[in-house]
Structure formats: C-alpha cells, structure tokens
Amino acid sequence: MKKIIIPVAAIVLIGVVGPKFTGNGINEGLDNFVSILDKSPGYIATIESRETSWFSSSAVINVGIDPLMFAESGLNPAEMVPFEDLSATINVTAQHGPFLTLNGLNLGLSAWKAEVDPSVFRELLAYAEDEKFYSVTGNVGLFGGVNFEDIMPKFTVIPQDGGDEAITFSGWNGKGTASSESATYSGAIDLVTVSAEGVTFEMQSMILEGSVEGDWTAPMRGDFYNSASQFAIASINVDMPMLDTSAKLEELIIDVKTQKSEDDNLMDMAINYAIGSIQAPQFSGRDLVVKTEVNNLEKGFFKAYQEASAKPAQMEQSIADMIETKLLPQLQASPEINITEMSGKVADGNFSGKVMAKVSAIDSLPESLEDPAFWVSKAVIDSNLKLDKAMILWVGEQVVANQIQADPNAAGMTDEEIKAIAGEQVEGMIEMFTQQGMITVNADGEYEMTFTMQDGQAMLNGNPMPLPF
C-alpha cells in the first residue's frame, strides 16, 4: 500500500497548488507553481517540457516524493527499492481567453486542466480504462477568480504477491475557488472498504472542507495564515471475527482553525475533536469532546521545525541548530498549550475538565535545558478535572484491574474474576484518595481535582504541593 499511498500525496498536491499557475500569466505562473511545489517539504517537482502558442500552452511536469525522507527509515536496500522513484508525470494544458472551450463553453482569462498519465498505477489499481487516476480542471474568470474541480475515480487494489486483500475506494470528488484574497476547497469520499487476513474495515462518508485567507500557498512555504477546516467521517467499522472482536466509531469531526497576529510573527492554532459514539471491547463512549489550543507559535521556530521535519537524515543536527538559534524567540513569545474543554460520557459516567499550560517571563535560556528548576519557575499551569460517581468508579476499576493483571500471582485469573476484585477494592481506594486530599467532592457531588502552578509554587486542590526540586 505504501507504493500507492505515498505517490498519491504528490499527485493530489497538484489539485492543491494547481490553480496558482493560472493567475499571473501562464508561463510565469507555471514556473511559480513548480517552484512552490519543489520547495514544499518532502516533494520534488520539475518541468520536463513545455510549449506555448497564441491560444494555448502545455507542459509536462514530474512530481515526486524526495527519497531523502526515507534515508534513515531503517529499511534495508531491498525494502528501499519502492521508494526510489515515487513520482508521477502530470500533463498540463491551458487555453488562453477570453473565449474558452477547454472545459466547456465559457468566458474568462484562461481554462486549464492537469491529468496524470493514463498508465499511472495500472499495475497496482484497477479502474475504468477511459479514466485517469487523477485529474483537475479549472477556469480563471475575467476578474481573476479561479474555480476548479478535481476527481479521482473508483478503484480497487490489485492483490500483490498472492495476497488475499480486497481494498475498494469509491472515488474522490472535490471543488474549490481561489483568488488573491482567499481560497476554499471541499471534497468527499463515499466509501472505503478493506478486507485482509480475516479483518474487515469500512469507512463511510468522509468529507474535507477548508478555507484560507490571503495567499493560500502560505502554508506550503511555512508562513503563517488565517484558516478554517473541518474533517468529518460518518462512521468507521472494524470487524475481527477470529478474535471475536469488533469496534464502531460514529460522527468523527475534527475542526482546525489558525489565526495569525497583525505583524505575522505569531500564530494561534485551535484543534477540536468530537466523537458522537464509540463502541469497542471494554470501552464505550458518547459525546466525546476535546478542544485544544496551541497559542503564540513563533514564525522562525515554526518554519525551522517544518524544514527539519522534511530532512530526516539531518534531523538531529537540524534540531540542535533550531534549539540554538530559534528556541529563545519562541519561548519569549510565551507559548501556550490549552485544553479548553474535554468532556463526554464513558460507560455510565460523565467527565469534564480543562488544562492550561504556558511558560512566561523568559529572557534567556538556562545553561542546561534539562534544568527542571528553571522550567518550574517559568511555568504557569491551571487544570481541573471533574468526574461523577459512576465515572470515578469506572476509572478506579480500570486502575485496580491493571494492577492485578501486572501481578504474576494473578496470571491464572479470568477477566471476570479480576473485574470482581477490582469492584470490591475501588470504593476503598477512592475514599483513601479523598482523605489524603488528592481528590475532593464538590457541592454537586462530583469528584474534583484542581492543580495549579505559578512562580514555582504548585497547589493541589488549594493546598501547597511540595516539588522534588
């Protein structure tokens, strides 16, 4: 599957960046497009050939994955062979306006399309003979706005080396707009199924939506940007009959928003997760929510980290250089990691909580970055967790059960016996923690834990908590 998935990332990137080359003039835009793609972490892009006439232009672009990404993957030479040429040829055609017929009759500055060769992945995938594995078409209006659509056909994976896997993909349909002020995109997959070695996997209705303000190639250059996106899956089902095990997840939603500062030097990022329900062996949950924020990301540090991540072979040296030259400006910006909400229902219980952690008032780095006293003196933490009675009983039972299972003397006990013993012990454990002040009971009958730290002083439920340094 790696031989398929990794090159697909390169091909689909055409749909993400492709509209860029239509805005300024075909040839200039094409050069900019390839330059942006080639500088994107992990990608290689070159113009193999191009032709330009009065009414049209065409080019052949080669897009691939940089093999240096796998230089320190730990794979032996034989396993590295599939990664040596992870590339695809993209045929780009553009028609000059104002009268356009390339993608249907229209008026505009230009019309364009980009398609992979008809032979792409034929040895690995089965899809209709009259279709390309990936294509994107678009028009540039008279005022410079871009509309485009991209398509990936329905396909099945051809089993390799006598395997019995069966993988189907219902196809991808996406559409978007782009201008000098913003860009939008949305796409969907109806169904993905996988069956291999007695395990079946089914994913239904995956939707991706997103928007970016300003120059929408900024994320690819490592610049900061304002954006909003959502990734949603209606359901995921996994069935493993040989283990008499199955799991189901419904209504997964991931929202991501970014907001840059007015001077473009800082960016806040919010990532929110929501799950309608999940059913798995020994676990069930409903209305699960985790809302997170990463605030005050500093531009130089963020960009250096992206560049280091794209070069695994030089990662160690890149990280060392980044710490030496970029870490202090990031820390001076007072970075924050916040969980503004975590809540839901697990088994028959409810929980809710929040965590805020940041560093502040850092003017210089300590002689040793491993000095815990320095970080404690600069850290600010504010956290709270609430569990109702059913929830704390469930958590306590899991803790006690894990302790019993780790005891060699319990090796012959059944899960039912372990659960029964855990149920007998958990009430006493909770009472002990309450008496010790590790947890409190609030006016609503909820079990609560509050931990704060500032100026090197830690507090647990309002009481000073000694630190080991």
Give residue ranges: language-model regions.
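Positively charged n-region of N-terminal signal peptides that target proteins for export
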Residues: 1-4
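Glycine-rich, small/hydroxylated-residue low-complexity segments
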Residues: 6, 16, 20-469
